[in-house]
Amino acid sequence: MPTTRESPALRALSVAGIVRSIASFQDGIFEDLRPFLGFDYKAWVNTPFDKRLLVQLEPFHALLLPWLADHSIDRLAQLFEALPDVAPLVTETAIYYGHDDLVAHLSAHWRHKATSLRSMDLAAWAGHFSILKRLHEEDFGGCSHLAMDWGARGGHLDIVQFLHEQRREGCTTEAMNWAANLGHLAIVQFLHFKRTEGCTKEALNWSAGNGHLDVVQFLHTHRNEGMA
């Protein structure tokens, strides 16, 4: 009986690598990458650290995690090639949600594409000391005075101490003001004895208004800003 011979073209199209190579010359992006088109990088990076940023982080995180589970971490290469502006968003999402392994991978393999200028600020805001330490040690991403301000506000003494010892960005009076407002006495004490930025009248106003008597007593004894 005659046999049906497969054409060379069909044999070529059965090889996944060849198909991917052919597809790379076509316009558009792979179907699994299309959902990432819905995120505005420029708007994201200009959003301050409050609920407005969480509105963007939460849906991106909800998309990213199952996508990585379906395609493996190696698929990031295609994502970053097709949508390079998405790379820093992946980094910021990994930092905020504490995905240390993903942060380590991005630092090792994608530091030039996936760097965020506010990486350490975001880690401090989220209270992830181990990630902040990694970012510092591997020089992956940026840091500003907001890191210590947010570390103090969140009650993360380990972060405040580390930034004081290892970084030079410092903080603002907002660090002690917010630590006092939220009753973080140990941080108020550390900032008073170890740093020079000080506070404003708001520190005593807020701590008194919120009933943090120990903080009020400390500020009354050691500071001279007074209260309004």
Please provide the spans of the model-predicted regions.
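Ankyrin repeat (ANK) tandem alpha-helical domains that serve as protein-protein interaction scaffolds
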Residues: M1-A228
